[in-house]
């Protein structure tokens, strides 16, 4: 699939397996989601631009590399996306954080927006939009719509697991947005849940039902 990157690193896949396990408790689930987000952030920033600068080491002056180009932003889709936020910030502590609040209507399966708060300089940033699951694609599409309406021009989407239906929908709605996923799953079931999936990420992160 164009613009879809499946992160097959052994550590990512090992941790994702434990995340999927129904016997993994809330504390371990939360810690593992955080760890996988950090590992995926390493991959998602692989194409960031560098420039040469002069640095004084204790022994001499040398030419070294430093990040340049777009400033970064992280936008978790509330509430489950919060579980991935800090893992990314460990690698990119200077990134600004915005939030998009959406919930899925369990009857229509459509997302409903209830909160949006973004940095003021959205047009200058590359945003990493995060949500543990990409099911129908509705929430991701609406979140990216929200950013674009407010001036954002550069975005990537990161999730732990995705259904092919959601990937297709997001690609069709926003072909300019690259998708990074740890596990590309089999399908959506008749209730709109990813199979095999990992259950309800929000409930498992926060210990709710």
Curated annotation (Swiss-Prot):
This protein's UniProt keywords: Allosteric enzyme, Glycosyltransferase, GTP-binding, Magnesium, Nucleotide-binding, Transferase
Main enzyme class: transferase
Binding annotation for 5-phospho-alpha-D-ribose 1-diphosphate: 79, 104, 131-139, 200
Binding-site list for uracil: 194, 199-201
Record note on cofactor: Binds 1 Mg(2+) ion per subunit. The magnesium is bound as Mg-PRPP.
UniProt GO MF annotations: GTP binding; magnesium ion binding; uracil phosphoribosyltransferase activity
Regulation: Allosterically activated by GTP.
Keyword Chloroplast appears in the UniProt entry: no
Names of the cofactor(s): Mg(2+)
CDD domains: PRTases_typeI
Task performed by this protein: Catalyzes the conversion of uracil and 5-phospho-alpha-D-ribose 1-diphosphate (PRPP) to UMP and diphosphate.
Protein name: Uracil phosphoribosyltransferase
Organism: Listeria innocua serovar 6a (strain ATCC BAA-680 / CLIP 11262)
Gene that encodes it: upp
